[in-house]
């Protein structure tokens, strides 16, 4: 996840270049982007997650939290079982949160 974010940062910084290599140097806040014949050191704190539910070191929910995002995740907690997460369209049926996952599972009774 962090490397994906760094690739996005890298592409934003070097939009017309083919690629860059990302190196990890032990501390999550000390990543370096290595570009051919050019080295960019990211500022301290550049990798801190702006999301209140996400632990920037593990890329998982912070201690005591259930989820980071998803249709059945609100304020870092799973939404109650039975809450509609996808409304029915046409002959379709509603999909409901299970209370145990951030995803919106398909209704098992659908054709």
Swiss-Prot record:
PROSITE patterns: DISINTEGRIN_1, DISINTEGRIN_2. The keyword Magnesium does not apply. Disulfide bonds join 53-76, 67-73, 72-97, 85-104. The keyword Amino-acid biosynthesis does not apply. It is found in: Secreted. Residues 47-111 form the Disintegrin domain. Residues 1-20 form the signal peptide. Residues 21-47 form a propeptide. GO terms for molecular function: toxin activity. Gene3D superfamilies: Disintegrin domain. One of its GO terms (cellular component) is extracellular region. A motif (Cell attachment site) lies at residues 89-91. Keywords: Cell adhesion impairing toxin, Disulfide bond, Hemostasis impairing toxin, Platelet aggregation inhibiting toxin, Secreted, Signal, Toxin. Belongs to the disintegrin family. Dimeric disintegrin subfamily. Heterodimer; disulfide-linked. PANTHER family: ADAM A DISINTEGRIN AND METALLOPROTEASE DOMAIN, ADAM METALLOPROTEASE. Inhibits ADP-induced platelet aggregation in human platelet-rich plasma (IC(50) is 8 uM). This is Disintegrin DS-AS. The lineage of its organism: Eukaryota, Metazoa, Chordata, Craniata, Vertebrata.
């Amino acid at each position: 996840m962090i490397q994906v974010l760094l690739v996005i940062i890298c592409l934003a910084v070097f939009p017309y270049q083919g690629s860059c290599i990302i190196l990890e140097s032990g501390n999550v806040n000390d990543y370096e982007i290595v570009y051919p014949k050019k080295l960019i050191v990211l500022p301290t704190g550049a990798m801190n997650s702006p999301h209140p539910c996400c632990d920037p070191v593990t890329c998982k929910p912070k201690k005591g939290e259930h989820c980071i995002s998803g249709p059945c995740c609100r304020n870092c907690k799973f939404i109650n079982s039975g809450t509609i997460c996808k409304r029915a369209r046409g002959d379709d049926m509603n999909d409901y949160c299970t209370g145990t996952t951030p995803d919106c599972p398909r209704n098992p009774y659908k054709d």
